[in-house]
Amino acid sequence: MLRTIFLLSLLFALSNASVQDFCVANLKRAETPAGYPCIRPIHVKATDFVFSGLGTPGNTTNIINAAVTPAFAAQFPGLNGLGLSTARLDLAPKGVIPMHTHPGASEVLFVLTGSITAGFVSSANAVYVQTLKPGQVMVFPQGLLHFQINAGKSSASAVVTFNSANPGLQILDFALFANSLPTELVVGTTFLDATTVKKLKGVLGGTG
């Protein structure tokens, strides 16, 4: 009996792509917590398993001088159900991917061009920082605050891969200053003065 229960629990934990060979996303249907519904295998094409978008640099003309080009199931249907996602990072000079977390996934960063200083902070507040060159890889454990900064004078780029179809994203600065949390509460919980908080809210579009 216990063996049967164990086997059933494993089956329920499997994704569609584990039960089947693959589950190419049907983008005409709504996404669910388990991903997109599968299109029928007879309609699957080789191009469903190919994504070309990571070969084009993103637009870095913005406040962080950086761009993220995602390759999730919505852009790359062949990834659906595989528990993977990927993206391209482009960092102009002085570009930064601010402190952020991915609650649902660990991340691997592979530097393509330029020089990138990257790091993360552990739950014990230990800091791990490294300047990476092309061909080097760094891993960021699930849920930990981490960042990437262009460490050179020219543009830099990288590819990141996640062990989840939905890694989630929360940017620390946006969480604090790009919402309607009252200034006095931000002051009380961050030890910043009200002038600084209001300035940051103004820059990031927050209110309160």
Swiss-Prot record:
Residues reported in the UniProt entry to bind Mn(2+): 100, 102, 107, 146
Carbohydrate-modified residues: 59
Tissues expressed in: Expressed during germination, and also in green shoots, etiolated seedlings and whole seedlings.
Principal subcellular localization: secreted
Signal peptide region: 1-18
Keywords: Apoplast, Disulfide bond, Glycoprotein, Manganese, Metal-binding, Secreted, Signal
Disulfide bonds: 23-38
Domain of life: Eukaryota
A cellular-component GO term for this protein: apoplast
Pfam families: Cupin_1
Function, in words: May play a role in plant defense. Probably has no oxalate oxidase activity even if the active site is conserved.
Extra remark: Is the most highly expressed of the GLP genes.
Quaternary state and interactors: May not form oligomer.
Recorded family membership: Belongs to the germin family.
Protein name: Germin-like protein subfamily 3 member 1
